Amino acid sequence: MGAIFFKEDSKLKKENRLLTIDGETLMSQPLTPLNFVVDTLLSQGLHILAGSPKVGKSWLALWLCLCAAQGKPLWTFATRPCEVLYLCLEDSFQRIQSRLFDLTEDAPPTLHFAVMSQQLHNGLVEQIEQFLKEHPQTRLIVIDTLQRIRTAGNDANAYASDYRDIGVLKALADKHRIAILLVHHLRKMNDDDPMNMISGTTGLSGASDSNFVLRKSKRRENTATLYCTGRDIPYRELALEFDGEDHVWKLLSDDCEQTEQSS
């Protein structure tokens, strides 16, 4: 059974009353569990992957798309094969082709790319809806980068603008039970909490279901930490190393696993 456990009453809508459900009824409903594109790491919903420019987040995003489309594990995390749409809006097909050759000899037909799209409030939602209609097995959409689909807003209402934009994409993800991952940037100013470094107001990070921050201690290093936090996943820090030959971020350690082993 799906997540809809009561029907909207036209009388309630007419009287402008809240549609509610009591706890006993709610707990008796056999609701559909969340879909996970990557087990315990990336569920259906709206997510942000943030990192400094040229830190390697697009390589990570592309490899994620490839793993999901092939149904191959992302590090130690299982994936389920599905169709994937990657909006690589800062790249060309030539660059994506070159990177695919670096990553694999066999790119699947279930992995789709676009280098141009409409903006968020000017046709993008309709474009995605049409793609999902044509490719109903799609479970993951990556938008690289978030800023490419946004229009300049009023700085005086930056929080409201951030929250509204994320809300539109989250509603789209929830409606179709898919994961949408937004590739984004970090602030230049350091912070003890990596999540506070996500560019923009807390309207972005607060409205998303999960946030991932890819952060190097020094730019020239080939190691980084992926900080992961979200509503439906445990907090974890993944120590990664970028392999310059395979062009893949390889897992060195997972502090969540270490915590479980020591407990």
Task: Spell out what each predicted region is.
Residues 43-47, 82:
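Pre-Walker A (Motif I) flank of P-loop NTPase domains
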Residues 27-33, 192-196:
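Short gly/ser/thr-rich secondary-structure transition/capping motifs
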Residues 1-18:
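Short, small/acidic-rich helices and loops at N termini and domain boundaries
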Residues 14-18, 24, 31-33, 37-38, ...:
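Conserved inter-motif catalytic segment of the P-loop NTP-binding fold
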Residues 48-50, 54, 58-59, 87, ...:
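Phosphate-binding/switch region of NTP-binding enzymes
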